[in-house]
Amino acid sequence: MKKVLFSLIFLIFLIVACGETTGEKPVNKGLAGFAVEFAEDFDLGSPEHRIENPEGGIVTTINITALGYDKKPLTDYSGEVEIGMLYGENSAVSRITMQNGYAGNIEVKMRYCLDNDRVVVQEVKKHEGEETYEPTGKIGVSPVFYTEVATISAIQGTVKGAKGAPSAFNNRNLTLKDKEMVVIAVIEGGFYLHEVGAEDYSSVYMYTYSTPYVDDNKEESMSLPVGTLIESANGSVFEFFGFTEMSFPTFHPVYVNKNGKKELKIDTSLIPAPKDVGDILTDNDEMEKHEASLVTVKNVSVAWFNEEDSSYIEYSQFPLETSDGKSIMAQTLYTAPLFNAVAEKPEEGKTPHHYNFTGILKQHTSARPSTWILVPRDMDDIECLDCK
């Protein structure tokens, strides 16, 4: 009997010792996260008053404090942390060692920041016998700061130098606004948007998957007209084989009031004249400046191609050749289907036709012999110079 009683008392002691009868929750100890503060003189900006975003990045300093679960400084903490950005990139020192729960006056150089961003600090550790650092899940973020809003020229003109010159804002969701923008072409699957007044990197493809429609005070929606002014557009920046696009966008046209009804504001005079790219076809850096823009190549003829090749069978892509031997691909299947590229192939004893080809400049890094592709808007963009 004494043994049973002793066992019962011992069991009760264990239960009490484990806290199961007290209603108390286990107490978390150690590092919970970090407080990240900017230098006192750093201007966070606001949605109404945005700070400048210089080409070399926004340079300032931060202070990092380790915090416990009680949200108080954890002065006995030592460890390694990495300093990055929520969206952009920190090009200053990215990994430091914290001692006594604090690291102060740490320089950050914040690049590729648009609209708003934050500095992110996370703890990292190396597993025994390994060289790579892994995050532990303990993080901290700075207050939000507001930089210049996204523009087409910023998205297209800020690149990271890899094949196809991808945008530095790849995979970011951004809103284009505060610039005058006009629709320069509507092609099945999307439309091309131009930033009025921008000379280079001025246009981008808005991939809508299907023909873009708008509601212009009519009973049924209508296809987005060329020349429509766009007030703002939101979408995710995506690199499709080197071609920068904004995927599945929402967009807001500019409307005007006419006789008590709202109508789309259309101004085709804002569509820029096509850029002659004949002299820069082999200069990828220069061609990048005109991606998704209206361009033209003059006095070209259809070069020989294998009509059984998948690039022609599946995508109707064929090469054009200039008088000095430069190449650019063309695609006419959807927009100018009456152009018979096969009939224009060079043959022995046959005099080739010469054309001025105008259209939208696309890029596909697997296309050959050129990764650049010219897509006419319609048959009017193909001018034969010597057809009878």
Predicted feature locations:
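Positively charged n-region of N-terminal signal peptides that target proteins for export
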Residues: 1-4, 19
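N-terminal cationic leader/targeting segments used for protein routing and processing
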Residues: 3-4, 127, 171, 266
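Sec-dependent N-terminal signal peptides
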Residues: 6-9
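C-terminal motif of bacterial Sec signal peptides marking the signal peptidase cleavage site
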Residues: 14-17
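Core sequence-specific DNA-binding domains of diverse transcription factors
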Residues: 19-148
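OB-fold nucleic-acid-binding modules
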Residues: 24-27, 35-54, 134-388
